[in-house]
A protein has these predicted regions:
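Active-site catalytic loop in hydrolytic enzyme cores
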Residues: 1-76, 80-94
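C-terminal beta-strand edge segments of enzyme domains
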Residues: 2-3, 102-106, 111-255
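Solvent-exposed alpha-helices and their adjacent loops that cap or buttress functional pockets
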Residues: 33, 40-44, 100, 122-123, ...
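Short alpha-helical segments used as structural interaction elements across diverse proteins
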Residues: 34, 93-96, 160, 172
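Intrinsically disordered, low-complexity boundary segments flanking structured domains
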Residues: 37-39, 94-96, 135-141
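Short, compositionally biased leader-like segments
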Residues: 84-110
Length: 255
């Protein structure tokens, strides 16, 4: 009933690309407005949207869906334990509760309960699938890393009534003009891998992050560690890439 393409893909994981990596080509085919990039479909059971895995790690995709009127976000993921899926870090739970709260919508988050491959440990993706309501309340959560079913009531009429209340209404008090500069200054460069020119290997994707780091340090958003200056920071990533290549965990360009 809708088609969505994952927007945020970590440079350090896999060779997948985002619409942003081929932005000019993508917009020619799929359009250049927020409703086409982050579609919400109006159905008899509510207004539905989706975001995929790393899309939920930052606020922008859920905010775009909220702007488009979403009431239920379906959110499939493959979050690993090393990313903080379980307590005490619990990154998976508190960020998704925040996305639901800030956009006054339900989030149905389905995470891998295990990965049955020899090269992954059994608890590599530890589950913790969840259902969060429009206030950010955790209604249900799967307690362990195996296949299971969780249920909760999705009360769309209650959500719509909640949105009529002025107090603690997360959309009423947004003052967009004060934040425009954040999004007018690019961070991750677009069109890195245009149509027909996918990344050859992981190192090619990671290379882009040097540009991003340089931007963040040069404009003073990030402060270098003690004894270093901003101009040195891209070189730090070069050293890490070379070390990973020497260890065989990151392929070289000619491999």
């Amino acid at each position: 009933i809708l088609k969505y393409h994952k927007w945020h893909i970590p440079a350090s994981i896999g060779l997948g690309t985002s619409p942003h990596d081929m932005l000019d080509d993508y917009t020619r085919v799929f359009g250049n407005n927020i409703r086409q990039r982050f579609p919400v479909v109006d159905t008899e059971i509510g207004k539905l949207g989706t975001m995929t895995c790393h899309d939920g790690a930052t606020p922008e995709v859920s905010r775009a869906l909220g702007y488009n009127g979403v009431e239920v976000i379906c959110h499939p993921t493959a979050m690993q334990e090393v990313e903080g899926t379980s307590p005490p870090w619990d990154f998976w739970t508190f960020t998704r509760r925040t996305r639901a709260h800030d956009n006054m919508c339900y989030i149905l988050g389905s995470n891998w309960g295990t990965v049955k491959h020899e090269y992954y440990p059994k608890g590599f993706c530890p589950g913790h699938s969840l259902i969060v309501d429009y206030t950010g309340m955790l209604l249900r959560q799967a307690p362990y890393p195996e296949e299971q079913v969780i249920t909760a009531t999705i009360d769309i009429e209650s959500l719509r009534e909640h949105r009529t209340i002025i107090n603690h209404n997360m959309w009423i008090d947004i003052r967009t003009e004060g934040f425009r500069e954040i999004y007018e200054n690019p961070i991750y460069p677009p069109n890195r891998f245009p149509s027909g020119h996918p990344p050859k290997n992981q190192a090619e994707k990671v290379e882009t992050t040097k540009t991003v780091l340089n931007t963040l340090y040069q404009r003073g958003q990030f402060v270098p560690p003690h004894g270093m200056n901003p101009d040195e920071m891209p070189g730090v990533l070069d050293q890490r890439i070379q070390r990973a290549q020497s260890q065989g965990t990151l392929l070289k360009d000619d491999e």
